[in-house]
Amino acid sequence: MAPTPDRDGQDKKVCLGVVTGAHGVRGLVRVKPYTEMPEGVAAYGPVETKDGATSFAISLKGMAKDLVICKLEGVDDRDVAAALRGTELYVPRERLPRASGDEEGWYYADLIGLRAVGLDGRDYGRIAGVENFGAGDLLEIAPAEGGQTVLMGFTDENVPEVDIAGGRVVIDPPAGTFGDDAEAERGE
C-alpha cells in the first residue's frame, strides 16, 4: 500500500490507489491499485481524498490490464471522472486488517519518513516512498545531504531489516546506488 507520511500522531490513512482517468462515458474511473490484490482498492469501505475533504462510496466494476475499473458514488459523467485524474484514494488505517508476514506487522505506508541507515550506521536519508513500476518494489530514498531521490530495489539483500519501533530501515545498497564508492565494500 502506498505512503501517507504521518509520524506525528494524526489519524493515519493508507493510500489504496490513484485515479488514472475516466473509463467510458458514465463516470467510471480507472484506478491504479496499491493493494496486494487489485480488488482490495474497493474492499475497505468508502475512500477519501488525501485532505479528507471528499469521500466516495466505491465499488469494483471490472479490470483493465493492471488497473481496476471503479464506480465512485456521485461521479456520474466522464468529465467529472476525468477531473479526478491523479486523485489518491485513502482509507483510515483502522479499517485494514493487521499486516502479515512480519511479527511487527507493517504496511509500506509505515516506512515513509523512517531513516535509511546502512549496516555501518551511515545515515543515507529518509524513506520518501515505495514504488513499483512493474519489475518489483523500490524504496525511494531522499538523501541526507539533499538532492534527487534515489531508487533502490526493496529486496531482502538490500533491506535486511525494517525496524518500525526504532524509526529506521537498515539498508545495504548496491555499489554506486548513492553515486559514490562507499558501498564497494559489499564486493559488487
Curated annotation (Swiss-Prot):
Transmembrane spans: none
Name the record gives this protein: Ribosome maturation factor RimM
Subcellular location, record wording: Cytoplasm
Tree of life domain: Bacteria
A biological-process GO annotation: ribosomal small subunit biogenesis
Source organism phylogeny: Bacteria, Pseudomonadati, Pseudomonadota, Alphaproteobacteria, Hyphomicrobiales
Family affiliation: Belongs to the RimM family.
Domain PRC barrel: 103-177
Assembly, per entry: Binds ribosomal protein uS19.
Matching NCBIfam families: 16S_RimM
Listed Gene3D superfamilies: PRC-barrel domain, RimM
Entry's free-text remark on domains: The PRC barrel domain binds ribosomal protein uS19.
Recorded GO MF terms: ribosome binding
Keywords assigned: Chaperone, Cytoplasm, Ribosome biogenesis, rRNA processing
Function: An accessory protein needed during the final step in the assembly of 30S ribosomal subunit, possibly for assembly of the head region. Essential for efficient processing of 16S rRNA. May be needed both before and after RbfA during the maturation of 16S rRNA. It has affinity for free ribosomal 30S subunits but not for 70S ribosomes.
